[in-house]
Amino acid sequence: MNILMVGDVVARPGRRVLRERLAELQDSLEIDFTVVNVENAAGGFGITANVLAEFRALSIDVMTTGNHVWDKKEALTFIDDNPDLLRPHNYPAGTPGSGWVVRESAGGVRVGVLNMMGQAFMHPVLDSPFAAVDQVLEQWQKETDVLLVDFHAETTSEKIAMGWHLDG
């Protein structure tokens, strides 16, 4: 299975490149499943309904975010209606949206995508991503064939620590 994960798509130039190149890249690499981080897609901060509609026209399976997810407050009005648009899972309970989703690829592979956010130098400071990831991994191992974690963090040390944590 070939998976494409695209980092932060930033503002109009990033959306243009994605619109112009994504299908070609997916075809040339025989991509089966695509995840794109969209947290900076609207003017460099957040996502709007219009920008989300642009992404809907592309072949994207899941969209992730990070600390800028709420920079455009209108995201609060549509995130619950878009289960493939994730916000970090380690936001407190009751936060709109979801931090994880299980989708089936075109080939029938069950892919779980978990969106997490680090704590170091991030605002707001969320619940421990390590504890939060442990809460879902055991359940997911029964429900998915592939587990992807998009860990949005500032420091290399926290990213490496999460890598070691997830490696078992």
Which role fits each region the language model picked out?
Residues 1-168:
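Acidic, metal/ion-coordinating pockets
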